[in-house]
């Protein structure tokens, strides 16, 4: 399996986390099983070839909502995908479907001019950059200028999760993405904002389904291979 991702253009920073591609790299009759872990994002996906399946066969164009546990999916060996990984607050710029209806599942979704529509939302992008960079709910509140209660309402409307729950997903996924290159899990836990290595271990078991040591070997982008 060949997976690669690229940062978004500056105009989309705060709304889009990454562009990515995925190819099975095998024959049409092959079937490749993977695990996706929570990353705090909504995925807008276009399959250019082959087949994919998660709780049933998927169409050529679909969106995947926030997940809060590892989810298994399969792709045929000849499958090829292009995806846009957006922060959840960007979803309302593209669809009237509530985020709650997309949580933990996929829905058929196709839209034209996605990046152009997102690029016009400069104020929302600025708020998004503050949210993503924050290390605590208090930092989110100070940076955005929202009171704690207003921030709670904003998250309910634009994310579908409480701020503290969402911050946990962001902290975990940052640690997950970087864990393959880490010689010391204890140092990695401290650098990633966990209270200690045991704290990181609990989140890896809950959100990746495997210990951090195993994830260090098997993590590839947002997947466990």
Model regions and ranges:
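DNA major-groove recognition helix of helix-turn-helix
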Residues: 155, 167, 204-205, 216
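Pre-recognition alpha-helix immediately N-terminal to the DNA-recognition helix
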Residues: 167, 171-174
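Low-complexity, intrinsically disordered or weakly predicted helical/coil tracts enriched
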Residues: 207-209
């Amino acid at each position: 399996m060949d997976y690669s991702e690229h940062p978004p253009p500056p105009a989309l920073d705060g709304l889009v986390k990454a562009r990515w591609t995925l190819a099975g790299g095998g024959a049409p009759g092959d079937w490749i099983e993977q695990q996706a872990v929570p990353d705090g994002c909504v995925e807008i996906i276009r399959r250019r070839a082959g087949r994919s399946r998660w709780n049933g066969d998927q169409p050529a164009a679909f969106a995947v909502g926030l997940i809060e546990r590892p989810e298994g999916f399969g792709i045929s060996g000849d499958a090829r995908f292009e995806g846009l990984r957006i922060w959840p607050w960007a979803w309302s710029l593209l669809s009237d479907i509530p985020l709650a209806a997309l949580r933990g599942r996929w829905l058929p979704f196709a839209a034209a001019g996605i990046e152009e529509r997102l690029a016009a939302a400069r104020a929302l992008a600025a708020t998004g950059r503050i949210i993503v960079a924050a290390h605590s709910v208090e930092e989110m509140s100070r940076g955005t200028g929202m009171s704690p209660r207003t921030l709670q309402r904003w998250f309910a409307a634009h994310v579908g999760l409480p701020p503290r729950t969402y911050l946990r997903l962001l902290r975990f996924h940052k640690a997950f993405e970087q864990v393959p290159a880490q010689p010391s899990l204890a140092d990695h836990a401290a650098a990633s904002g966990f209270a200690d290595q045991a704290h990181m271990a609990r989140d890896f078991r809950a959100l990746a389904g495997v210990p951090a040591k195993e994830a260090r070997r098997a993590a590839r982008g947002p997947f466990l291979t």
